[in-house]
Amino acid sequence: MSWSFFVNHYQNETQARRDSKYTYRLSNGTLWYGLDPPEDAEPLGILYPRGATLGGSAQLNAMNFALPPESDWNYIAELTGDKSWSSNNMRRLFVDLENCTYAPEGTPGHGFDGFIASNRNNISYITERPGVVEVLTHAFRLTEDIEVENAEEVGTLMQRDINSIGPDRYAPGLYQLPLHIDGLRQRTGSWGYLHETLIAKTEDGSPKYPLTISTQSLATRVLFKDGKDGKPRAYGVEYLKGEGLYSADKRYNESDSGQLMNVTASREVIVAGGAFNTPQILKLSGVGPREELESHDIDVVVDLPAVGNYLQDNYEGGVTVEASIPWENNPFARCDFSLGPNDTCLQEWNQSHTGPYGEGAAPLGLLYKSSVSETDESDLFLFGAAGVVFRGYFPGYSTYQAPPTSWFWSVVKMQTGNQAGTITLRSADPREAPEINFNFFAEKGDRDLQAIQEAVEHTMQIFNATGEPYAPYTVIEPPPSVDVRQGIMDEAFSHHATSTCRMGPAGDKDYCVDSNFKVNGVDGLRVVDASIFPRTPGGFPAAPTFVISQKAFEVILKSIKN
């Protein structure tokens, strides 16, 4: 279900390889990660998995469904001059697509009839854990200046709704994370919507909707012809039919080139390949920076420098400590994560849709405002848990089992100042994954590092306030052997890539698409995915990406009616 990209965080190789997650390929073909690679190891970079199934990364993400701050939508409205991108209208679109299962029906700002269900984790997995309650008691005091007396009060406060309507939605505080799961604890997303549309039948058994989905297909380029006044117009898509044809696919076989096919469009072509693959497809189609395209002997359809540039992401800096004793009542302690017949957690899920495998993201969310926030709102979104650890991606990350004494906070930086990332072609072969350079901290790096450091220090204050029997703590990350900022730089990661086909004023070549998702310089072509965000929205891109898809639906439907 995933493609395994390997990305570069830094141009400086010495700095890049200080990351304990840095991955190499050995001469026998196996992957190895760590700080002291064998002599025959080929450097690959940092693992960055992406969804490679119908529904994209929303089918394998942590299901976080938090909306971004209103200021992110208003920024797009101001940048493009299009008021329909204002936060009020984007909230209306969110209401249209949401089917909220955790708030009372009719709650303002929520929808209850949409195709994306929303829910939250089991609050008892917080309130029935004395050590977790103890830590959160200090977290509320140090973050919000709230004195909490007992587990019941912790539960009440944690169930405040970060997706509610209100001016203080992104004020510092603690919350449960909203998830795109339904009342049966099942993931929801575009996959389900597409599947329901595909299988719908009329009374005579014929397909109800004219939808065809071609799986096991790799888009290679958009096809163009001369349109009005000689302006290029997209009229179709060329693709390869076959299994595992992309080099980031674990099944990839270089000798298998697939079957070349094409499909034509009666109206328009829409590219929705995500922040890595959308710019690759556009460049292979002749839409991108002229010099790069010509270096690969690709005919230039339109010189559009914004394609593949301005790659952005949320930095994440992990905080991991180990307590002196295990954190009690860990619901995951009885899971063996094998997904086999002896996995009691899987048995519980299959029988009743309950238990730890019905949980998503992390049980704890914390908003924090640093001294360098560009607005009056929080600029960091932390999520965490006791008894488990998430510290980024490396071979085998999904089966890693942390000690029961572990506690992690993942510090997600919003309002990141770095727009220096790039997606560039390695060749004109559509099967070859592009070169991905994030160029961490290349722009406004000191500011972003300062913010992350303050959030790290805030979490340590919370731990230090939580005494015995959990204290003393052993700090695992950031590595205590180096300066805090150096430790953040060494182990920082990201997995919310955006902005490689960013939206902006129509016709401006510093931007890729206009406010109606139309690609600059051509007709009949739109992009609808996270690559269009002019800056990474909030701390988690899933909900805002669902919302822009609803926006595109309205825009395209209106254009057809007109």
What feature does the model see in each segment?
Residues 41-43:
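Conserved oxyanion/phosphate-binding beta-strand-loop segments in alpha/beta enzyme cores
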Residues 6-39:
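Core domains of carbohydrate- and sulfate-ester-processing enzymes
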Residues 1-6, 11, 45-48, 53-54, ...:
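Structural core of flavin- and non-heme-iron oxidoreductases
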